[in-house]
């Protein structure tokens, strides 16, 4: 891997203050917590509950293991992302059509894959998530703009001990101690393969990565731009 990582057990983070990229983890819950045909979990009135299920069960487990969580929600997206957000919207619409076609054809595997590509985070889901976090006693904050940037800012101000996200942008924003796979379950299916891999939390050490790569953060950002991610 490009960056220096170290696999850990959740228990190793006991007592640590961790800022979690809220939008990232909610998308993760909405993508992965689904039924066999790709449909989202719903209550008796048809309201989506996948995001709430993820928050309740997975965050509760982290708290039980002694982690002190703070969830960071995105604010207004930067204007530079306008075209990208429109491209994503169009891809989701295309995936929606392909999902419905796969269901009609009885192809449950393709249906589930396409369904995951339609994932949308609606404003009411954010409101519901914040309410559940309040009930669980887990603090949350709204970022001025990008959640990953706010996570890195909290970390660099010493207000938390680690940042957590699946998005490497958090590292590019300067998160020096970064955790991935914090809220993922133990196994994950590889895309388009009948193969499962074990997933465990891992820490990315930014300073060790810089030493290994002989780069600084500005140069790493340049590499990310050249790679298109």
Model features per residue range: what roles?
Residues 42, 83-229:
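Extended two-metal-dependent nuclease catalytic cores across DNA- and RNA-processing enzymes
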Residues 1-92:
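Non-catalytic, usually N-terminal nucleic-acid engagement modules in DNA/RNA processing proteins
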């Amino acid at each position: 891997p490009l960056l220096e990582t170290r696999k850990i057990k959740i228990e190793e983070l006991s007592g640590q203050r961790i800022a979690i990229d809220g939008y990232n983890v909610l998308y993760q819950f909405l993508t992965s917590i689904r039924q066999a045909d790709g449909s989202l979990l719903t209550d008796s009135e048809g309201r989506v509950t996948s995001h709430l299920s993820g928050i309740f069960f997975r965050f509760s487990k982290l708290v039980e293991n002694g982690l002190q969580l703070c969830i960071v929600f995105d604010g207004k997206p930067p204007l530079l992302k306008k075209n990208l957000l429109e491209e994503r919207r169009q891809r989701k619409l295309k995936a929606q059509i392909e999902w419905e076609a796969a269901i009609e054809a009885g192809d449950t595997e393709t249906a589930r894959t396409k369904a995951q590509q339609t994932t949308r985070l609606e404003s009411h889901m954010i409101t519901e998530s914040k309410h559940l976090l309040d009930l669980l006693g887990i603090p949350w904050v709204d970022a001025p703009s990008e959640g990953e940037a706010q996570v890195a800012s909290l970390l660099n101000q010493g207000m938390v001990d680690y940042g957590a996200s699946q998005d490497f942008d958090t590292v590019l924003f300067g998160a020096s101690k970064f955790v991935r796979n914090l809220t993922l379950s133990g196994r994950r299916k590889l895309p388009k393969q009948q193969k499962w891999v074990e997933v465990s939390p891992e820490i990315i050490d930014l300073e060790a990565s810089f030493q290994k790569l002989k780069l600084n953060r500005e140069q790493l950002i340049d590499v990310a731009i050249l790679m298109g991610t």
